[in-house]
Design a protein with these regions (language model features):
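Short, surface-exposed beta-strand/beta-hairpin micro-motifs centered on an aromatic residue
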Residues: 3-12
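A short, solvent-exposed beta-strand micro-motif common in secreted/extracellular proteins
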Residues: 6, 16-34
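Beta-strand-rich modules
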Residues: 15, 19-20, 147-149, 154-180
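Structured interaction patches on ligand/partner-binding surfaces of diverse proteins
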Residues: 26-55
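Structural beta-strand segments of beta-rich domains
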Residues: 75-79
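Short amphipathic, basic-aromatic surface patches that mediate peripheral association
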Residues: 82-104
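Short beta-strand elements
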Residues: 175-196
Length: 196
């Protein structure tokens, strides 16, 4: 199963020849048009026997990073986050539009999440909902904020003496795999925060 460091482990596979493909918040490695015609195949055919390493180079939709260190005041964590495009609008359109059903709103950044957790694997599936927060954006309203610092902060008051981990995430209005209804986040690195 997928690990937070991007590796995948499944110990229940039989020895044999496999076609390996991945989906995530990046330009799809396998692209087909609406009638099923293959446009690009970045999957890998490989023999799996024991531990097998397969490396995929991907083009993320977004890059998310903290600017400076998160600050704590009265149990509330504030941080500055910068979101930039991982690929230009032109490259995104060039690779996605031929797949069909193109919509300009695919490029829209829809939300920024600020995940807080006791776990160093902090993220959507490992977050404390009491303290995690989100900011939603409609239409193209985030466009002017690309490359600029956005302030995020935790909800509630985290008790003194706790050690938590924070991570920011952002996503665009595009499903991966196409038509799945799943819009995936691009994440920052996790950061440890001590609550004084």
């Amino acid at each position: 199963y997928c690990m937070m460091d991007g590796t995948f482990q499944n110990t229940k596979l039989f020895k044999g020849e496999y076609n390996v493909r991945i989906d995530g918040p990046f330009i799809p490695l396998v692209r087909e048009n609406t009638d099923g015609t293959l446009l690009h195949d970045g999957s890998v055919n490989t023999e799996i026997s024991g531990t097998t390493k397969v490396k995929f180079e991907v083009q993320p939709f977004l890059n998310v990073e903290f600017v400076g260190d998160p600050q704590v005041s009265n149990g509330v964590i504030k941080a500055q986050v910068r979101v930039t495009r991982g690929v230009s609008d032109e490259v995104f359109r060039e690779k996605i539009q031929p797949m069909g059903n193109w919509k300009d709103e695919y490029l829209n950044v829809t939300d920024i999440q600020f995940f807080v957790s006791y776990s160093n694997t902090v993220g959507y599936r490992a977050r404390d909902e009491r303290w995690s927060s989100s900011i939603s954006y409609e239409g193209k309203s985030f466009e002017d904020l690309l490359g600029k610092e956005v302030i995020v902060q935790s909800n509630g008051s985290i008790p003194s003496g706790r050690k938590v981990f924070v991570r920011a995430a952002a996503r665009i209005n595009y499903d991966t795999p196409v038509g799945s209804g799943t819009r995936r986040w691009n994440y920052s690195e996790p950061v440890e925060v001590l609550i004084p």
